[in-house]
């Protein structure tokens, strides 16, 4: 008789019997409800599948994918420079961080990280810190709206407008800028930008003080946020959670300090931390981060020395200062003369045409670059096969990773606490689904 070589498993019994027995012993009915994807208190098109035992959440699952746009796949059919117009639309509240992470990865592949002009790096840092401020204000505004505090919502969006006005002045758009490019930035700061930023530095501390008055000692806000959605350092590290959630649990991990990029090692700032590990602690960390961002921006203005804002290699860098003709159509003669060079070379114009239409070629290889976005570690993994287009680009979006913590934060709490928990994560579904 031949001994069976396969392993046979009895499908009955084991853990499943325990689950059935527990359900039979339960005196209450379990209710499964869908919160979202079109619920007024969820961030974007996020679907939460909650199992309730009365008011208590016994199981929380996250349903994503409702905002899938195929950005990563589409980038495989565009040039490396055109990729910035795609990545800026992922997490649409932090577009400049998306662009920077992508461009840092491309610059690593090209081997030009150290050739990016100093002025371009200072502008990148300043724009990112302004973006951090605007993102945190949206986080607090939407959180207030979801808890019914409409004054917090209106104030948060009002403060954000100050930042968006600067973005519009510099890039021409309030969102989806495509301003940061491989090798530098699209163009220099327009006249009046420094004065506009200094106005923000003067006014913003007063606005922050008003926001603190609304929330810091508000008994209703404290009741809804303290000891709610608790997640300690161990839980954060096990789930890969980064950003304000991790720092609110007591670990001062910030890529700007741990793995500096764009010259962050030359700036003086602190990493706000808390040991509360709850919703209230995350709010306090975000408020403190806004203050540190203002400190960094002030240093940026002092470091803004005259100079180029795009790498000088003509095979990579586009002309950084575009100008329209007097009729409002086409490029100005001065701009075309700049492209063609002093001798009016037709070859230079042809090269420029090929650079814009075909793009530059990137040597074969792989590179990963990460930045500290307002939500956490935002990483870009880029693969080149030596062509003018990416072979593969993949992003580690912090909202996607941090949403894994929903179950740990919500199970055992109440339905009302689910709203506070998700809002404290501050996910943006454009970055989650991509």
Swiss-Prot record:
Alphabetical list of PROSITE patterns matching this protein: COMPLEX1_49K (PS00535)
Topology versus the membrane: Peripheral membrane protein
Cell compartment(s), UniProt: Cell membrane
Catalytic activity: a quinone + NADH + 5 H(+)(in) = a quinol + NAD(+) + 4 H(+)(out)
The UniProt record lists the keyword Translocase: yes
Keyword Oxidoreductase: no
GO MF: NAD binding; NADH:ubiquinone reductase (non-electrogenic) activity; quinone binding
Major subcellular site: membrane
InterPro entries registered for this protein in UniProt: NADH_Q_OxRdtase_suD, NADH_UbQ_OxRdtase_49kDa_CS, NDH1_su_D/H, NiFe-Hase_large
GO CC annotations on file: plasma membrane
Transmembrane segment boundaries: none
Record keywords: Cell membrane, Membrane, NAD, Quinone, Translocase, Transport
E.C. no: 7.1.1.-
SUPFAM superfamilies per record: HydB/Nqo4-like
NCBIfam families, sorted: NuoD (TIGR01962), PRK06075.1 (NF004739)
Subunit structure: NDH-1 is composed of 14 different subunits. Subunits NuoB, C, D, E, F, and G constitute the peripheral sector of the complex.
HAMAP family in the cross-refs: NDH1_NuoD (MF_01358)
Family: Belongs to the complex I 49 kDa subunit family.
Role, per record: NDH-1 shuttles electrons from NADH, via FMN and iron-sulfur (Fe-S) centers, to quinones in the respiratory chain. The immediate electron acceptor for the enzyme in this species is believed to be a menaquinone. Couples the redox reaction to proton translocation (for every two electrons transferred, four hydrogen ions are translocated across the cytoplasmic membrane), and thus conserves the redox energy in a proton gradient.
Protein name: NADH-quinone oxidoreductase subunit D
Species of provenance: Thermobifida fusca (strain YX)
UniProt gene name: nuoD
């Amino acid at each position: 008789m031949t001994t069976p070589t396969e392993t046979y498993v009895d499908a009955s019994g084991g853990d499943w019997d325990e689950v059935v027995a527990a359900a039979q012993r339960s005196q209450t009915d379990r209710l499964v409800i869908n919160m979202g994807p079109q619920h007024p208190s969820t961030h974007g098109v996020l679907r939460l599948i909650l199992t309730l035992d009365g008011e208590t959440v016994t199981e929380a699952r996250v349903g994503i994918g409702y905002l899938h746009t195929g950005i990563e796949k589409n980038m495989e059919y565009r040039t490396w420079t055109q990729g910035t117009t795609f990545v800026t639309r992922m997490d649409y509240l932090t577009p400049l961080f998306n662009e920077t992470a992508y461009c840092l990865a491309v610059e690593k592949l090209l081997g030009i990280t150290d050739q990016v002009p100093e002025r371009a790096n200072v502008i990148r840092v300043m724009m990112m810190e302004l973006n951090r401020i605007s993102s945190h204000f949206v986080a607090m505004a939407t959180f207030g709206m979801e808890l019914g505090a409409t004054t917090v919502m209106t104030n948060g969006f009002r403060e954000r407008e100050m930042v968006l006005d600067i973005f519009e002045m510099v890039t021409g758009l309030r969102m989806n800028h495509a301003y940061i490019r491989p090798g530098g930035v699209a163009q220099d700061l327009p006249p009046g930008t420094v004065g506009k930023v200094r106005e923000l530095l003067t006014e913003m501390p007063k606005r922050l003080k008003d926001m603190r008055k609304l929330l810091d000692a508000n008994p209703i806000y404290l009741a809804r946020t303290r000891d709610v959605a608790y997640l300690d350092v161990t839980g954060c590290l096990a789930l890969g959670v980064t950003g304000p959630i991790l720092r609110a649990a007591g670990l001062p991990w910030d890529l700007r300090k741990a793995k500096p990029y764009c010259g962050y090692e030359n700036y003086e700032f602190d990493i706000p931390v808390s040991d509360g590990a709850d919703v209230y602690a995350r709010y306090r960390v975000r408020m403190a981060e806004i203050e540190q961002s203002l400190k960094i921006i002030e240093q940026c203005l002092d470091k803004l020395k005259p100079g180029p804002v795009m790498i000088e290699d003509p095979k990579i860098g586009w002309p950084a200062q575009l100008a329209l003709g007097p009729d409002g159509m086409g490029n100005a003669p001065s701009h075309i003369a700049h492209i063609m060079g002093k001798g009016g070379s037709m070859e230079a114009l042809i090269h420029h045409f090929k650079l814009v239409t075909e793009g530059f070629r990137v040597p074969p290889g792989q590179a990963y670059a990460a930045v500290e976005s307002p939500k956490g570690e935002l990483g870009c993994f880029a693969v080149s096969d030596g062509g003018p287009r990416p072979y593969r680009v993949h992003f580690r979006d912090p909202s996607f990773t941090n949403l894994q913590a929903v179950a740990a934060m919500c199970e055992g709490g109440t339905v009302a606490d689910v709203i506070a928990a998700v809002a404290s994560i501050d996910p943006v579904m454009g970055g989650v689904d991509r």
